[in-house]
Regions:
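Active-site-adjacent structural elements that line small-molecule/cofactor binding pockets in enzymes
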Residues: 1-177
C-alpha cells in the first residue's frame, strides 16, 4: 500500500493533492503540522473528497505539545468526521514518553474510564465521552521515512509503519504490523 504526504501551502492545494492521491489509488494521505493549522482539523476537512482513503494527521510529538488525552479526544473527532478512517501518525523525534502517550491514547479510545499509571502521563478515571466511529479504534502510524529502523521501545506500539519510497519523496510505503 502507498501513502502520500500532502505538502501544499494552502487549503486549495491540499484539496487538490488529496483528490489526486485518491484518484491515483493511494491508500492514505497524511497532513502534517504547518502554518496552515492543525493537521487533525485539516485532515477532517479532506474527508468528503477522498471517501475511500485513510486520513492521517502527522504530528512531531513531544512532551511540551498536546497532552495524549487531548490528542485522543481530537483524533476521535477526526474519526467521527471521516467514518472510521483516521490515522494518528507520529513523526520523529521518537522518545520513550511517546510509547506511553500511544498507550494512553489507545486506552481513551476504548469504552469506560481509563486509568494510566505511567511515569509521564498518570491519569485517573479519564473518559473520552465520544467514541470512535467504527468497530475498531483509530490506527497509530510511525513515520520512519527518515530513519533506518524502529526504536526498540516502540516495537508493537503502532498499527502501521511508513517507509520511504526512493522514487517519490512525497510518498511512503505503508506496512501493517
Amino acid at each position: 500500500m502507498e501513502g502520500r504526504f500532502l505538502r501544499a501551502g494552502d487549503t486549495a492545494g491540499l484539496r487538490a493533492e488529496a483528490t489526486r492521491a485518491g484518484a491515483e489509488g493511494a491508500a492514505a494521505v497524511f497532513v502534517s503540522e504547518s502554518a496552515l493549522g492543525d493537521p487533525i482539523v485539516l485532515a477532517a476537512g479532506l474527508a468528503p473528497l477522498v471517501p475511500r482513503v485513510l486520513l492521517g494527521a502527522r504530528i512531531a510529538w513531544d512532551r511540551e505539545g498536546r497532552h495524549p488525552a487531548l490528542l485522543a479526544r481530537d483524533v476521535t473527532g477526526l474519526d467521527l468526521v471521516c467514518g472510521g478512517r483516521s490515522v494518528l501518525c507520529f513523526a520523529p523525534p521518537f522518545t520513550e514518553p511517546l510509547a506511553e502517550a500511544i498507550s494512553l491514547c489507545r486506552a481513551l479510545w476504548l469504552p469506560g474510564e481509563a486509568v494510566h499509571e505511567g511515569p509521564h502521563f498518570p491519569v485517573q478515571a479519564a473518559a473520552n465521552r465520544a467514541r470512535p466511529a467504527g468497530e475498531r479504534i483509530p490506527q497509530i502510524a510511525l513515520d520512519l521515512t527518515a530513519r533506518d529502523e524502529l526504536p526498540s521501545f516502540l516495537v508493537g506500539a503502532a498499527d502501521l509503519l511508513l517507509w520511504p519510497l526512493a522514487e517519490a519523496p512525497a510518498a511512503c510505503r505503508l506496512e501493517s504490523v
